[in-house]
Each structure stands twice: as C-alpha cells, then as structure tokens.
C-alpha cells in the first residue's frame, strides 16, 4: 500500500575529512629528500536535489539516518587522498528544509535546485604542506575535520495552483477526478481521502494544477478529525475553492454554516503560520464556492435558492455543479484558469539559481576571530570560542608533541595567549577550546618564530609538567604487564611519581 509521507526528520552526518600523511622522501643518493606526505581528501557532502521523479518523502521515513563517505587519508610521495563521494538525496518539488528550531533554511520549488544539507569536513594537511623555513621536515600532519552532523526537518508542500477544501464527503475527490486524470479513492463515507491528491487540469491549451486535501471539520485546529496538518499543501495555491455538499442530511448543517466553519479553521491555521509563503495571507487569497451534488433534485433546488445569498454575504463567485453527472464543470474550469493566470502574472519571477548554500559570516580581520569568556563551572578558568581555534583543535593530534607545539604557535599568532594574559589568566589556569580542556602554560608570544626541535617532539613540552607521548606509552605498557614496573631509564626516573599519581 502506498503511503503519503509529507514530513520527516533526517539525521545527517557528512563525511569526515581524511587525515594528512607524515612521510619523508626516501631515495638512493638523496639523503635530504624532505617531507612528502600528502593531504587528506575532503569528506563527502550530503546534497538535496529536486527531481520530478519523486512525489513523496516516503524513502526518508524508512531510512532517516544518512551518512556520506569519508575522505581518504593522504599518502607518501605527495599523494593526496581521494575526496569522499557526495551523497545526493532526491526530493520532490515543494520540499521545505527546516532546522531543529523550525527555521526555514531552503524552499526547494524547482526541478534541479540543490541544497547542501551537510558539508563534508576538510582533509588534514600532510607534512609536505606544513613545511616552512623554520620547520623544514615536520614530524606531524593535521587530522581531517569531522563533517557536519545535525538533524533537519523536511516538509512537503504541494505545488498546486488551486486548493479544494470542504467537509468530509463533500465531493472534493470526485471533482478532481472528473477535472483531471487523477484517480483518488472515492467513497460515500467520511474521511475517504487520507492523503492529498494532485491533478493537472487541461483548459484548451492551458493547464493548472489542483490539490484535494482531506476533509476538515469544526475543531480541526484542536486536533479533531485529521487536524490541520494537511493544510500545508494549500499554502502555495493561488485560489481556494470551497466544495459544499448541498445534499447533506446532517442536522445543523447548511451550505452557509459549512463555509463559515471552514473559514474559521483556515483562520486558525493561518494564525499558527510563522513564515511568509510569498503569496500573502490565506485570508486574502481569492475564493470560489462550488455547490456540489446538483444531480440530486432537492440539492439543486437548495443551491439555486442560496446562490445569491452566498454571493452577497461572502462576495465570492458561486458555481452550481455535479461532479458525478459532470454538470457545470466548463464555466468553473475557465474561471479558475482566469484567476490562476492573473496570479501568475503578479507573482515575482524566480531567480535561476541551481544551488542554495547557507550563508556564513566571514571576518577576514584578526580582531574578533575569537572570544575569551570566564568559565562558569571552573574557578579561574576560561572558555575560548571562535571558528579558527575550534577548528585547529579538531585538526591536532594530541599524541604528537610537535603537533601540540604547532597548535600553540597558531594560537599565539592569532593572539590568544596575549588575550589570556589580558583577561587575567594565570599559569596553570584551566582553558577550554572546542570541548578540549588543558592547563594554560604560555609557550610562545604573538609574532615569535616557531621553536626548532626534533621531528615529533617539542622542547617546550619537555620543560613543563606535561606527560609526553613516550611517557604515556611506557605507563600503558606497565599497566598491561608488558614491562617491569621498576624498569625505568635514567632519563625517566623523575617522571615515576607522575605515572603513579
């Protein structure tokens, strides 16, 4: 059984960037070949693309978790890692993309439009790209950045010109079936239609689309019946058509009270909308009234009697038809086409943009690229935020002392160490950047040259109380029983207390 799904939550994870490579060129008769580690590949993006071949969000309902391909790691001999393959998700026209807060990120209305739903992470630089005059053979590389991971909400709003609204069993499905090639389910019981139906109406050489939404009842805005969720499919319509059942025998119902009840529910739905569809308020949208089931003699007599009263009270054109007998359809078609064409002329032309990218603020000045704030949870601690320092933290291999020293140089050059001094930070203060906390020990002042040191090491770290990678490795071997606990080298005796502590 086909299911119509018009709202889903996607859990997206773009591809992580590949890691850079640490490699030194080795060749006969070339003792100083230099670094030749390649860069990691960019992680794959997750892209939403509009296609006419898809009409529902059903696939995402069953497969909401989506992950793109990771970028390949770099290799020696200057070989860069391959870029992760982009993952393209096909969506139907009229798909609206929202974030977790309900804010609209993109409105995908035209076939071919694309939206980058989650961007892949940048690949890490290899040691060849990190080489400089001061650091000619880096013994480290940068780690690939993680891809974006977040949840997005997709909502489908039908791209119809005409929207049919009415009580259950008013004949909306019958009307769309005789005016177009649509084949909706039709029955003589309430709520036969459980999903929107879309049909194309031909009028001479012109066409327009018509949407039939499930029936409304008084109190739908409070969740009665099928509620108002399906009304999102008439938000884009140029004209609304009230389909009224003139043959109903329900007590307390008549055509005028039916119209008033439906208008009250539409007003309740409009008040709940927090975005502009570009077509104005639903209450200002042109309306028509269709008095259906004129094939029943009593119903036709009632329709003729009330037609003038409805036109005077509401000011809308009124048509008496019979969908079953195909009576009175042509005048209705031509009137709807006239209103739709007029609305199309007034509608602003869409810009031919195939790709939509979320805008991001870019500050090319050094000042303002980071912020230092007191840590509310740690006495005397600080939290540093900013795109660059948080990204650099993710790129750093903290098992490599030289990589940590390189990070310190970058942070100092950005002005963070000077900023911490001005903020009143003391040596040993707890500093948090991008979820990583460490004790602050000033190493470099802004503008100083990098410290020359051996590959994979940094002499500044040896002068501090920081446990080195070699010490951590030996402590791990002791815990696993691979070496004797008292088997320390002469140069490591001083660190024994730190291991045990």
From Swiss-Prot:
Molecular function (GO) terms for this protein are: GTP binding; GTPase activity; magnesium ion binding
Q: Report the residue ranges that make up the OBG-type G domain in this protein.
A: 160-341
Q: Domain Obg, which positions?
A: 2-159
Localization, per the record, is: Cytoplasm
Biological process terms in GO annotation:
ribosome biogenesis
Q: Which InterPro entries match?
A: G_OBG, GTP-bd, GTP-bd_Obg/CgtA, GTP-bd_prot_GTP1/OBG_C_sf, GTP1-OBG_CS, GTP1_OBG_dom, GTP1_OBG_dom_sf, OBG_GTPase
Per UniProt, Mg(2+) binds at: 173, 193
Cite the binding residues for GTP: 166-173, 191-195, 212-215, 292-295, 322-324
Main localisation: cytoplasm
Catalytic activity, EC:
3.6.5.-
Query: Is Magnesium one of the keywords?
Result: yes
Q: Which UniProt keywords apply?
A: Cytoplasm, GTP-binding, Hydrolase, Magnesium, Metal-binding, Nucleotide-binding
According to its UniProt record, which cofactors does this protein need? Mg(2+)
* UniProt cross-references to PROSITE patterns, sorted A to Z: G_OBG, GTP1_OBG, OBG, OCT
Q: Which Pfam families match?
A: DUF1967, GTP1_OBG, MMR_HSR1
Ranges where the OCT domain occurs = 362-442
Function as written in the Swiss-Prot or TrEMBL entry: An essential GTPase which binds GTP, GDP and possibly (p)ppGpp with moderate affinity, with high nucleotide exchange rates and a fairly low GTP hydrolysis rate. Plays a role in control of the cell cycle, stress response, ribosome biogenesis and in those bacteria that undergo differentiation, in morphogenesis control.
Family of this protein: Belongs to the TRAFAC class OBG-HflX-like GTPase superfamily. OBG GTPase family.
Subunit architecture: Monomer.
Task: Spell out the PANTHER family in the cross-references.
Answer: DEVELOPMENTALLY REGULATED GTP-BINDING PROTEIN-RELATED (PTHR11702), MITOCHONDRIAL RIBOSOME-ASSOCIATED GTPASE 2 (PTHR11702:SF31)
Name of the protein: GTPase Obg
């Amino acid at each position: 059984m086909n299911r119509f799904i018009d709202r889903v939550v996607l859990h997206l994870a773009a591809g992580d960037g590949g890691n850079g490579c640490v490699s030194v060129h080795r060749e006969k008769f070339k003792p100083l070949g230099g670094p030749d580690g390649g860069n990691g590949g960019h992680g794959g993006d997750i892209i939403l693309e509009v296609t006419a071949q898809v009409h529902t969000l059903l696939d995402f309902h069953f497969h909401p978790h989506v992950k793109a391909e990771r970028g390949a790691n770099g290799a020696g001999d200057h070989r860069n890692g391959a870029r992760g393959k982009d993952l393209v998700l096909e969506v139907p026209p009229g798909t609206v993309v929202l974030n977790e807060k309900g804010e609209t990120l993109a409105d995908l209305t035209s076939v071919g439009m694309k939206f980058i739903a989650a961007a892949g992470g940048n690949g890490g630089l290899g040691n060849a790209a990190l080489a400089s005059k001061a650091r000619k053979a880096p013994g480290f590389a940068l780690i690939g950045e993680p891809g974006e991971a977040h949840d997005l909400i997709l909502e489908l709003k039908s791209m119809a010109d005409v929207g049919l609204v009415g009580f259950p069993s008013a004949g909306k499905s019958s009307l769309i079936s005789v005016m177009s090639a649509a084949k909706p389910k039709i029955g003589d019981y309430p709520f036969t239609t459980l999903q929107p139906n879309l049909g194309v109406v031909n009028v001479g050489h012109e066409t327009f689309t018509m949407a039939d939404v499930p029936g409304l009842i008084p109190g739908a805005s409070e969740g009665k019946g099928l509620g108002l969720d399906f009304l999102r499919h008439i938000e884009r319509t140029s004209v609304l058509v009230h389909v009224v059942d003139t043959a109903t025998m329900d007590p307390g119902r008549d055509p005028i009270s039916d119209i008033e009840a439906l208008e009250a529910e539409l007003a309740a739905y409009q008040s709940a909308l927090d975005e502009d569809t570009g077509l104005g308020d639903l209450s200002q949208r042109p309306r028509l009234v269709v008095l259906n089931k004129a094939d029943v003699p009593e119903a036709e007599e009632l329709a003729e009697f009330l037609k003038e009263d409805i036109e005077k009270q509401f000011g809308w054109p009124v048509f008496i038809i019979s969908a079953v007998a195909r009576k009175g359809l042509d005048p209705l078609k031509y009137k709807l086409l006239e209103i739709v064409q007029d609305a199309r002329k007034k509608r602003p032309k869409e810009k031919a943009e195939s790709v939509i990218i979320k805008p991001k603020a870019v500050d090319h000045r050094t000042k303002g690229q980071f912020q230092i704030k007191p840590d509310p949870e740690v006495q005397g601690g600080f939290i540093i935020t900013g795109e660059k320092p948080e990204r650099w933290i993710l790129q750093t291999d903290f098992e490599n002392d030289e990589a940590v020293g390189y990070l310190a140089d970058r942070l100092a050059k950005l002005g963070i160490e000077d900023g911490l001094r001005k903020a009143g930070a003391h040596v040993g203060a707890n500093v948090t950047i991008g979820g990583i906390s460490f004790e602050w020990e000033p190493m470099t002042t802004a503008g100083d040259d990098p410290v020359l040191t051996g590959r994979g090491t940094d002499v500044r770290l040896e002068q501090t109380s920081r446990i080195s990678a070699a010490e951590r490795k030996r402590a791990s071997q002791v815990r696993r029983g691979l070496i004797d606990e008292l088997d320390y080298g002469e140069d490591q005796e001083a660190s024994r207390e730190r291991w045990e502590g």
